[in-house]
Amino acid sequence: MKVLGVIVEYNPFHNGHLYHLQQAKKIVSPDYVIAIMSGNFCQRGEPAIINKFARAEIALKNGIDVVFELPTVYALQDAGGFAFGAITLLDKLTVVTDVVFGSESADKNFITTVAKTLLENPDKFDNLLKIELKKGLSFPNARKFALKKFLNENEDFLKMIENSNDILGIEYVKSILKLKSKINYHLIKRIGAKYNDTELESKYSSATAIRNAIVRNNPFETYVPQTSYKVLKREFSYGRGPVSLENMEQFILTFLRLKHRKDFESIYSFTEGLDQRFIKAIKTSKKLSDFLEKVKTKRFTYSRIRRAIFHALFDFKKEYIEFSNKLGTQYARILGFTKKGQKLLSKIKKASKIPIISNPSLHEKVLKKVLTDKDRKWEVNKKLFIWQFEKDIVASNIYTMFYPQKNERKYGLDFRKPIIEGENE
């Protein structure tokens, strides 16, 4: 049995995503396809444009058999944390045979060489990284130049290591190697617009450009499959989107104005004076864009700053994130499945090293059952399971507060919304 895993955000699901999925299936010829998908907040440090259940529905309509949620504590981390959370989830399910990810270079040897080198020589690389960071470079640039020196590579190497998907790909492979996972990995050449392109250009435009068009109320139908377009328009018609960082502006600024520097001491990602820059900037910022601009330096990128805001908002304690990045994902929360996927879920439930959560209301009962089960080798830490799960619930409760339609801003989305049971179209 071949089971393909894809790691996605689908924010929103667009033509490039469909191409990636179709190509992945051609490479692997899987019996089933699993998606590990970010929940209501995404890796760039932004809310998803529509909620996780609607995005899971679109995924099922386009060829995914089962959608699991990537816990918020990983979805809102940098490439390393994001990748580790997703790969540990796939690995602990024990049924996934292959993973396919997009890459600008599609150079498997390059990606593997860099991943192995980073994994085998962490101290030497860390020292080079610190030297570059002291020059005032952003983390991505510091990593790029440190890797160039570390591997003694040429200028072409620098161009490759700048690519968003190549960087993420390196982290995926690094996690697979670190876990000694048996999962096979494959690369697909990324086509169309670049990850960060902000304007619609072709059939394969970036998710960023499509979100910008949606927020500006511009046409976007050409750039997404019809199945995606219909669900997006339905959610918008009910006032359950679009949700954007701009919607949250006053809430975020108010939250930050209530903070003191000491409040950030225990929060993950507040290092190297970021807390001081937050406190200084919020005193003179009337708009979120002003705040981001004032905090930004070569070292602190916009994405890192946005993620740090949500780390503070969701109270991401350093000790728990570090613990999460050591032990990995503690459960597999189902967002949706097809009839075909239901057969796979039966197999997963018998073999998984982490509990499968289908009904969030019963998560405590599920945990208790796992902790008292002596017949199976579970990889679950009680304290971490509870903490990771609670952060998902908090994230949903905050997310729904920013639906355009006030009547839709209900508490307890995770407990009210049933699992999506869809069919491929």
Swiss-Prot record:
Gene Ontology BP annotations: tRNA modification
EC primary class: ligase
Cellular location(s): Cytoplasm
Keyword entries, A-Z: ATP-binding, Cytoplasm, Ligase, Nucleotide-binding, RNA-binding, tRNA processing, tRNA-binding
Primary location recorded for the protein, binned into one broad class: cytoplasm
Record GO cellular component, one term: cytoplasm
Protein name according to UniProt: tRNA(Met) cytidine acetate ligase
GO-annotated molecular function: ATP binding; ligase activity, forming carbon-nitrogen bonds; tRNA binding
Naturally occurring in which organism (per UniProt): Thermosipho melanesiensis (strain DSM 12029 / CIP 104789 / BI429)
Keyword Nucleotide-binding: yes
Binding site residues for ATP: 7-20, 102, 165, 190-191
Lineage: Bacteria, Thermotogati, Thermotogota, Thermotogae, Thermotogales
InterPro entries, per database record: Rossmann-like_a/b/a_fold, tRNA(Met)_cyd_acetate_ligase
Catalysed reaction equations from the record: cytidine(34) in elongator tRNA(Met) + acetate + ATP = N(4)-acetylcytidine(34) in elongator tRNA(Met) + AMP + diphosphate
Enzyme Commission numbers on file: 6.3.4.-
Physiological role: Catalyzes the formation of N(4)-acetylcytidine (ac(4)C) at the wobble position of elongator tRNA(Met), using acetate and ATP as substrates. First activates an acetate ion to form acetyladenylate (Ac-AMP) and then transfers the acetyl group to tRNA to form ac(4)C34.
Family according to the record: Belongs to the TmcAL family.
Any matching Pfam family: HIGH_NTase1
